[in-house]
């Protein structure tokens, strides 16, 4: 969120933690991360970043939630499912949804299925291919604590859409702030 807002894009960060939302809206951060405090403060003061506990209508949605392991060592996709279902009511034709959470192969398609079930009035790549109303992609976030701002901007990113159009749209979005290369592929390969 901060990386996009630092490029003067309107961003609404969504978190279920009301304390984190309040902290961000004061222009402060709730984690320790070099340079992030300055970027958030400037973005909030400039009117480019705000936080909310509920999703709002947007052109693009990035889902970055935990994907812990269950007791049987299987990934727990409950947070991804919850996030997808929370944005579904505010999705509109032309929206782009990108999953950034570390996820197993097939997770992006599963997320698209949850969205399709919640919004039968919209078409998704698994149904409509290139003509989908909503584009879906996967772009794993890979950063080291203490270097988040530098790595978000400088690192190469693997971006995989469910269709070539989805990949192109996701790549164009990340190029707003990314100085590294966008390595474009499909969602399963990116996962």
Predicted regions: what they are:
Residues 1-27:
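NAD(P)+-binding Rossmann beta1-loop-alpha1 motif at the extreme N-terminus of oxidoreductases
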Residues 8-11, 49, 132:
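A generic structural motif
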Residues 26-43:
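Short, conserved SAM-binding/catalytic segment
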Residues 45-58:
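Short acidic low-complexity segments
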Residues 60-62:
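N-terminal Rossmann-like NAD(P) cofactor-binding module of classical short-chain dehydrogenase/reductase
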Residues 65-67, 102, 163:
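Short glycine-/small-residue-rich Rossmann-like dinucleotide-binding loops
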Residues 69-142:
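Rossmann-like NAD(P)(H) cofactor-binding subdomain of soluble oxidoreductases
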Residues 114-138, 143-191:
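Internal alpha-helical scaffold of NAD(P)-dependent oxidoreductase catalytic cores
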């Amino acid at each position: 969120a901060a990386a996009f807002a630092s490029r003067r894009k309107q961003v609404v960060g969504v978190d279920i933690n009301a304390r984190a939302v309040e902290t961000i809206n004061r222009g402060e951060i709730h984690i320790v991360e070099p340079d992030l405090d300055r970027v958030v403060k400037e973005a909030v003061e400039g009117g480019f970043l705000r936080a909310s506990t509920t999703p709002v209508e947007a052109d693009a949605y990035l889902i970055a939630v935990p994907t812990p392991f269950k007791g049987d060592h299987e990934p727990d996709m409950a947070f991804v499912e919850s996030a997808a279902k929370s944005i579904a009511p505010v999705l509109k034709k032309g929206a782009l949804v990108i999953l950034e959470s570390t996820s197993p192969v097939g997770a992006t398609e599963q997320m698209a299925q949850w969205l399709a079930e919640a919004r039968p009035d919209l078409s998704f790549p698994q149904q409509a291919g290139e003509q989908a109303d909503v584009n879906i992609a996967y772009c794993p976030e890979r950063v080291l604590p203490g270097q988040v701002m530098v790595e978000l901007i400088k690192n190469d990113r693997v971006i995989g859409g469910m269709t070539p159009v989805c990949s192109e749209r996701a790549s164009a979005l990340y190029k707003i702030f990314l100085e590294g290369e966008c390595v474009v592929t499909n969602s399963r390969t990116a996962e």
